[in-house]
């Protein structure tokens, strides 16, 4: 059987990398020849999780077709979020928990998606269905992914399935998930040593909304006022990125992981800003607005933006 690469989205988070590792282990147990790779360097939070459970970060690839003919995707499906030459390889499997958009294939494939908080929750279910024993390190990295995506089960995306998976995986991994989870999340909040340009690209995704190219980035912090001291520098970096990459709107969500509130910074045309204001029923003040209780890009940001841009 020919080798296949497994990877998550660009600017990978803990779910994108952790689930790729877990899926590669599962598929290899089932007779496939796979390797987990990444479409970018691991962030600080992910590095903390990888180190905790004894993994080295997957190697980073820029293209896939120079290595393999087929790939498996986790934690994404939209082509603009995938490897640059996704149109040159065959997608044989997808496991995801996001909306399906601009995705089509020439051949039938395995596609599994569910509205849960994290792709690793689906992966945990797949291990159980296949009756494949989950090793301690794999359990740990899947646990880390769920904690990351659900903000320690506090995100509105959290489901009973996520909670069940966390309990089971923490037991296998041998950790107190609340204590470990808080340490892991805090490891990803150190922004002092990073440039604004790096921060707005660390966890960012592009969305095509009714012909508009919308970029939504998110950074997690424990000190929101400190992060907002860099507001003007953030806006400058966002504006420059929009001009160079052709974004019609760039939104940066700065989320306080301790109180589950966010502040949004927005750059773009007057028309796109008006659509942002309509989406969240609010008014921007100097390109900034508070978004109380908003922590999930997938559930609380993209759906209202989609509705506003398509209205």
Curated annotation (Swiss-Prot):
GO molecular function: inorganic diphosphate phosphatase activity; manganese ion binding
Name under which the protein is recorded: Probable manganese-dependent inorganic pyrophosphatase
Organism lineage: Bacteria, Bacillati, Bacillota, Bacilli, Lactobacillales
The keyword ATP-binding belongs to this UniProt entry's keyword annotation: no
Residues binding Mn(2+) 1: 9, 13, 75
SMART domains: DHHA2 (SM01131)
Enzyme class: hydrolase
Cofactor note: Binds 2 manganese ions per subunit.
Residue numbers binding Mn(2+) 2: 15, 75, 97, 149
Catalytic reactions on record: diphosphate + H2O = 2 phosphate + H(+)
Originating gene: ppaC
Organism: Lactobacillus gasseri (strain ATCC 33323 / DSM 20243 / BCRC 14619 / CIP 102991 / JCM 1131 / KCTC 3163 / NCIMB 11718 / NCTC 13722 / AM63)
Location in or out of the cell: Cytoplasm
């Amino acid at each position: 059987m020919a080798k296949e690469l497994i990877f998550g989205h660009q600017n990978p988070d803990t779910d994108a990398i952790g689930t790729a590792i877990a899926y590669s282990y599962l598929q290899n147990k089932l007779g496939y020849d796979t390797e987990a790779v990444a479409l970018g360097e691991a962030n600080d939070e992910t590095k903390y999780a990888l180190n905790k459970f004894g993994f080295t970060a997957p190697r980073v690839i820029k293209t896939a077709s120079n290595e393999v003919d087929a790939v498996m995707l986790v934690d994404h499906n939209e082509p603009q979020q995938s490897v640059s030459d996704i149109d040159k390889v065959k997608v044989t499997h997808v496991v995801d928990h996001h909306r399906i958009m601009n995705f089509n294939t020439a051949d039938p494939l395995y596609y599994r998606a569910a509205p849960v908080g994290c792709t690793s929750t689906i992966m945990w279910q797949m291990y159980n269905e296949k009756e494949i024993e989950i090793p301690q390190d794999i359990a740990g990295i899947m646990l880390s992914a769920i904690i990351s995506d659900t903000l320690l089960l506090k995100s509105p995306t959290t489901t009973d399935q996520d909670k069940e998976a966390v309990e089971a995986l923490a037991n296998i991994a041998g950790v107190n998930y609340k204590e470990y989870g808080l340490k892991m999340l805090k490891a990803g909040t150190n922004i002092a040593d990073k440039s604004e340009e790096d921060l707005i690209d660390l966890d960012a995704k592009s969305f095509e909304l009714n012909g508009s190219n919308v970029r939504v980035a998110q950074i997690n912090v424990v000190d929101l006022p400190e992060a907002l001291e860099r507001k003007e520098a953030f806006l400058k970096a966002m504006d420059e990125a929009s001009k160079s990459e052709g974004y019609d709107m760039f939104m940066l969500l700065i989320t306080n992981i301790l109180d589950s509130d966010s502040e949004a910074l927005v750059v773009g045309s007057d028309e796109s800003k008006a659509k942002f204001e309509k989406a969240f029923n609010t008014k921007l003040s100097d390109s900034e607005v508070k978004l109380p209780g908003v922590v999930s890009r997938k559930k609380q940001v993209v759906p209202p933006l989609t509705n506003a841009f398509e209205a």
